[in-house]
Structures are given as C-alpha cells and as structure tokens.
Design a protein with these regions (language model features):
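Active-site loop-to-helix "anion-binding N-cap" substructures in soluble metabolic enzymes
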Residues: 1-241, 246-311
C-alpha cells in the first residue's frame, strides 16, 4: 500500500510530515502533525528532524522555511498556491504604506514571504484579535489581505482606525449568508462554527447580537478553535463554515457527533493538489525544496516572531 510506503520512507529518511486541516484524508493519515497555520508554524520551529515535508499551500511551506532556517522544507507540489495570498503584491503594499507612513502593518499569515518581510506583525485567524489589541489604540493599522477577517477583527476590538485591504479567500468568500440561512432553517438543534474569513461572518455577528438566532449557538473561530470547541461542546450536531477538509479530522476525533458543511462546495483546489502519490514522490526524490532568500527571511521572521510572542 502507498500509505505504508510513505510511512516507511519518512522513517528511513527521518522526515517530519506536517499537514494542514484542509488536506485530503489520505494525506492527513500519514502526517505527524495536523493543524492550522499557527500550530504548524510552531511545530516547524521545534521539531528535531532536519527535513520537513509540508503538505499545504506554498506560503505555508515558506513560513516553515522562515521559522526554521536550519532545516530543509519540501512541498509535494510547487503549484499549490493561494487566491488570498495572490490578492496583494509587494508593490501594492509598499504604495499603501507610503500613503499611511505612521501606520502599523498587520498581515495575515496567508501571504508570501516577500509580503511578510514588509510587515510589522503577522497574524493568523486564531490570534488576529490578540495581535491588534497589543498595538496602542491611537496607532493606525493597515490590515491585509483578507477583508472579512479584517472586518471581524475591527468589530471585535472596536478599532476605528483600521484600514482593511480588499482581498479574500475564494473558498471562504463563497460561504454566504444564504448557505447559513438554509442550514438554520433545516437544522433546529445544530450549533454553528464559522471561520472569520467567510463572507457570512459580519452579517452573522450582527444577527447574533440582535438575538435573531434564539436557541442556535453560533461561534466564530479559527480552524483550531473549531477543533477545540466541538470536542468540548455538549452539542451533538454542528454546521461547519470553512473548507470541508477539516470535517475528516472532526469526525475522527468526535465519532459520536455529526458534522455538516455549511457549503458542500467549499473545497480549496490548491489544498487538494497535494495527493498521497505526490507526497510519496516528494519523499522519494527529496523534492521540491522551498527556499526563501536570507534577506527576506530575516525581515519576515521578525514579523512572525512578534506574532508568536503575543500568542
């Protein structure tokens, strides 16, 4: 079996496999660690193995290379990109910063290494609120690139001086209020867990505050926040508004509970480019290595380390 070959090879070559929550089940099954962007960044920094095989999209492998400069980072497919990280270029960011010279720039980890090297702080969906709260309130903030996460953070923190870039994740932007309304009508006892990148987040927050959902519990959480919440909650049925790959891990860890995607079509084609066959080829051929130029990596590391110190 291919799975057995992968497990054998990674042991022989002393390679650690990190996989994002959105990876296909066969890839999650061979990983040493499965998690969100923040959790995997931390694992990359502390694992003892000198080679990391990163099963996720390209910016995640770059982040692993930045936080682990003494390790070799491989990715099974160099073409596994990200519509959100592509929504801002370094030239656009530099121009934006020039227009707001006294502002603090806070960038989602879903950005390229070059973008990170221009930031004051990185953040993830699980710590964005903490990062913004750590910045003096009188300071203007440039938040990029996800407009739905940015709007959520501005609302939670009460910041009136946040400029928000108009980028989006095409998968999360596709999870609309209509998807949620339909599930609310169909599933009277379900609890809703919603990723802050979703386009339904802001209207949902308004409706929760107004008491519109009555007995429905609605939580807005990062993917790892979702994992922790569903395991602790007494609810038996959950509607999950994020990329559908996370449902596999949820069902594995909570077999007695039911998990329903808010949108069955919420699949990231870039995440799904990483297959078990490509993982095997990457291990066997020891490719494709992800390298970040030292000058860019050193600057980007500062923004990431500031984030990790707050988290």
């Amino acid at each position: 079996m291919l799975k057995d070959e992968v497990l054998k090879l990674k042991k022989e070559k002393d390679v650690v496999i990190l996989a994002h929550n959105y990876q296909v089940p066969e890839v999650q099954d061979v990983a040493d660690f499965v998690g969100d962007s923040l959790g995997l960044s931390r694992q990359a920094a502390k694992v003892k193995q000198k080679t990391i095989l990163f099963c996720g999209v390209h910016f995640m492998a770059e982040t692993a290379a930045i936080v682990s400069p003494d390790k070799r980072v491989l990715i099974p497919d160099l073409e596994a990109g990200c519509s959100l990280s592509d929504s801002i270029t370094v030239d656009q960011l530099r121009k934006w910063k020039k227009e707001h010279p006294d502002a603090i720039s806070v960038g989602y980890v879903n950005t390229t290494a070059e973008i990170k090297s221009e930031l004051d702080y990185c953040c993830t969906s699980s710590n964005a609120v903490n990062v913004v709260n750590a910045i003096p309130r009188e300071k203007e903030i440039l938040f990029l690139p996800d407009m739905f996460l940015g709007s959520y953070v501005a609302k939670i923190t009460g910041r009136k001086n946040m400029q928000i870039w108009a980028g989006e994740c095409h998968v999360h932007a596709g999870i609309t209020p209509d998807h949620v309304e339909k599930k609310l009508a169909e599933l009277k006892n379900a609890e809703f867990v919603i990723h802050p990148e979703c386009s339904c987040t802001t209207p949902m927050m308004h409706d929760v505050a107004s008491g519109r959902y009555k007995n429905h519990q609605v939580q807005i959480l990062s993917t790892e926040g979702m994992m922790n919440h569903v395991s602790k909650s007494d609810s038996q049925q959950f509607v999950v508004a994020t990329e559908t790959g996370i449902l596999y891990r949820m069902r594995q860890q909570n077999p007695q509970k039911t998990f329903i995607p808010a949108s069955e079509s919420a699949e990231c084609e870039y995440m799904k480019m990483i297959t078990l066959d490509k993982v095997y080829r990457s291990l066997y051929d020891e490719k494709y290595e992800v390298k970040v130029a030292k000058k860019i990596a050193d600057k980007a590391r500062l923004a990431i380390e500031r984030m990790l110190s707050i988290s």
